A protein has these predicted regions:
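Intrinsically disordered, low-complexity, charged/polar segments
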Residues: 8, 60-102
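N-terminal start and proteolytic maturation junction detector
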Residues: 4, 23, 44, 71-73
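Short coil-to-beta transition motif at edge beta-strands of beta-rich domains
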Residues: 17-30
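Basic/aromatic-rich interaction segments and small domains that mediate binding to polyanionic partners
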Residues: 44-64
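Short polybasic amphipathic segments
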Residues: 2-5, 54, 78-80
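Mixed-charge, Lys/Arg-rich low-complexity intrinsically disordered regions
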Residues: 2-19
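Short, charged beta-turn/beta-strand-edge "cap" motif at the junction between a beta-strand
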Residues: 31-35
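Short beta-strand-centered aromatic/proline hotspots
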Residues: 36-44
Length: 102
């Protein structure tokens, strides 16, 4: 089991708990409050917890992370999932994005 503790945000993230599903849209918040949209195309469970494989919907860049936080608890730079109104993309659209990214 892996737990990440944020000293600044006073939050804990348990990677053994799956927080999003495949085809779910993720919001990336960067420097200067810039926003990117990612979509999860694969959820993998490893010995260290869940790993989310995603693709940027604009640049088609593939990335992965094991830390996703709820959008309702936004605190600085990071990747967030909408825990109130989750958004999903069509599986066919996601497959096309992944193919373009590879």
């Amino acid at each position: 089991m892996t737990k990440y503790i944020s000293l600044f945000g006073a939050t804990t993230t348990d990677t053994q708990v799956q927080v999003v599903k495949e085809n779910q849209v993720i919001i990336g918040i960067g420097a200067g409050a810039s926003r990117k949209r990612y979509v999860v195309y694969k959820v993998e469970h490893t010995a260290r917890g869940y790993v989310y494989h995603m693709v940027d919907t604009e640049t088609k860049e593939i990335s992965q992370t094991d830390i996703l936080r709820p959008l309702s608890q936004t605190f600085g730079i990071g990747r967030y999932y909408d825990d109130v109104n989750p958004e999903f993309m069509d599986a066919f659209e996601v497959a096309l994005l992944v193919r373009q990214a590879e």
